[in-house]
Structures are given as structure tokens and as C-alpha cells.
A protein has these predicted regions:
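Short, Lys/Arg-enriched N-terminal segments with co-localized hydrophobic residues
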Residues: 2-9
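Absolute protein N-terminus
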Residues: 9-11, 250
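ABC family nucleotide-binding domain
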Residues: 11-229
Length: 250
């Protein structure tokens, strides 16, 4: 009975997930659960499998073996596209905005085309989210006229406009000039107060300390350690975690 109660609160579950690209095994038996509403931050060195992990979680990549469940539903070759549309939004490193569409058109394209939301309703919601990220005045300009920080804030507004229960962030500040990083982090910190589930790959340790319910450390395709920010940053258990933090927290 207790196990069934716990399962009811899980949004994402990975069981023994492996992912290979040719002969290269990037994920090596990942087990991970994410409860509804959790703010999960994934950290680790470059090449550790972090980005591949979240792309397998949301169905952008098909796992080589193992199982991925979204809200209790097994993700398969046939179901993963539909589950991705229904449950997941993604904020990428490189913004991935359509340069030939206005900001408003970028935000409303997927809700109208994929979710069949009436255009007027989608535009009203998009404007709400543009106001939230402080860019309502940019609704009818093209992305190429905006700074990198503004484009990433637009990408966050786009993810909110889908109204999906989980938002994935794949190193959302890594392509930004240093002076633009904080404006994006501030939006993400504000968003963390919502009920939405957030899965964030980042090198921003201050953000992880402030926002995460749990921090996961990946290395070599494995999850080596996980815990609350307080425990993870002040009393890590694994020697590899200690070595990583000693370099990145200098």
C-alpha cells in the first residue's frame, strides 16, 4: 500500500536506463525517480551524461535499454512523442527559437499546432508569460533582434506557455555572456516557487544551493551521489564528488 502511495506522487521514473551512441555507452544503468513538483538539479563534469540523461527522461532520445515512466505510463517507441508533448517542455542551451517567426509566434506555435489551443487563448497566455519574464514589449519583434539573455527568457516563456507539468533546462546559461546569466537565473528562481516540476542541468552552483530540493551528481554515465543541497555541498560522501566540488567551488 505504501509503495502504491509513493508511486502516485512520482512524475518521472527511470529503471536501469542505458543509452549508447554506436559503441559509446553514455548512460550506464541509471535509476532515478522525480516526484511531482520537485526541483531537481543535475551536475557533473563535461561528458558525464547529464544532457543525455534529461533527453532520455523527456523522450527526445530513445533509451537503448531500460524503462522510462512518465506519470506511470511506460515510454515506448510509439508513445514517447505523445508523452513528450503532453508532459514536457524544454529550455535548450542555444535557445532554439525560430528566427523567421516573431516572439509571439514562437510562443504560440506549439500550443496551437500540437495541443489545438485556440489562437486567441494561446496569445493571451503567451502575453502573460512574456510579462512574467519582463519582455511583453518584445512580443512582435524577431528573436535575432534580442540579446542572448532576452532570447533565453523568451525560451522560458515559451516553455511556460505549453502548460506542461515538467520543464527541463539543459545548461540554460552556458551560451550566455557572463553579464546576462543572472537575468535568466532570476527568472528560474522565481519560477521555482510554482508547482511545476523542474529538472535542471547546470554548472551554476549558487542556483543549485538556492533552488534545488535535491542535487544529483553524474560522472562517467553513472549517478554517483545525490542528496539535499545542504548535505551535498557541505558533506559529500563520494571521493569523486569531493574532487569535483573542490575544483568548481574555488
Amino acid at each position: 500500500m505504501l509503495d502504491r502511495w509513493r508511486e502516485a506522487f512520482l512524475l518521472i521514473k527511470l529503471k536501469n536506463v542505458h543509452k549508447r551512441f554506436g559503441h559509446l555507452e553514455v548512460l550506464k544503468g541509471i535509476d532515478l525517480t522525480v516526484p511531482k513538483g520537485e526541483k531537481l538539479v543535475i551536475i557533473g563534469p563535461s561528458g558525464s551524461g547529464k544532457s543525455t540523461l534529461i533527453r532520455c527522461m523527456n523522450g527526445l532520445e530513445e533509451v537503448t535499454s531500460g524503462e522510462v515512466y512518465i506519470d506511470g505510463q511506460l515510454m515506448t517507441h510509439k508513445t514517447r512523442a505523445a508523452l513528450n508533448r503532453q508532459y514536457s517542455s524544454m529550455v535548450f542551451q542555444q535557445f532554439n527559437l525560430y528566427p523567421h517567426l516573431t516572439v509571439m509566434e514562437n510562443l504560440t506555435l506549439a500550443p496551437v499546432k500540437l495541443k489545438k489551443v485556440p489562437k486567441a487563448e494561446a496569445e493571451a497566455l503567451a502575453m502573460e508569460n512574456l510579462k512574467r519574464v519582463g519582455l511583453a514589449q518584445k512580443a512582435h519583434v524577431y528573436p535575432t533582434t534580442l540579446s542572448g539573455g532576452q532570447q533565453q527568457r523568451i525560451a522560458i516563456a515559451r516553455s511556460l506557455t505549453m502548460k506542461n507539468p515538467v520543464i527541463y533546462f539543459d545548461e540554460p546559461t552556458s551560451a550566455l555572456d557572463p553579464e546576462m546569466v543572472q537575468e535568466v537565473l532570476d527568472i528560474m528562481i522565481e519560477l521555482s516557487h510554482d508547482d511545476v516540476t523542474m529538472v535542471v542541468v547546470t554548472h551554476e552552483m549558487g542556483f543549485a544551493r538556492e533552488v534545488a530540493d535535491r542535487v544529483v551528481f553524474c560522472d562517467g554515465g553513472h549517478i554517483l551521489e545525490q542528496g539535499t543541497p545542504e548535505h551535498f555541498f557541505t558533506n559529500p560522501e563520494h571521493e569523486r564528488t569531493k574532487a569535483f566540488l573542490s575544483k568548481i567551488l574555488r
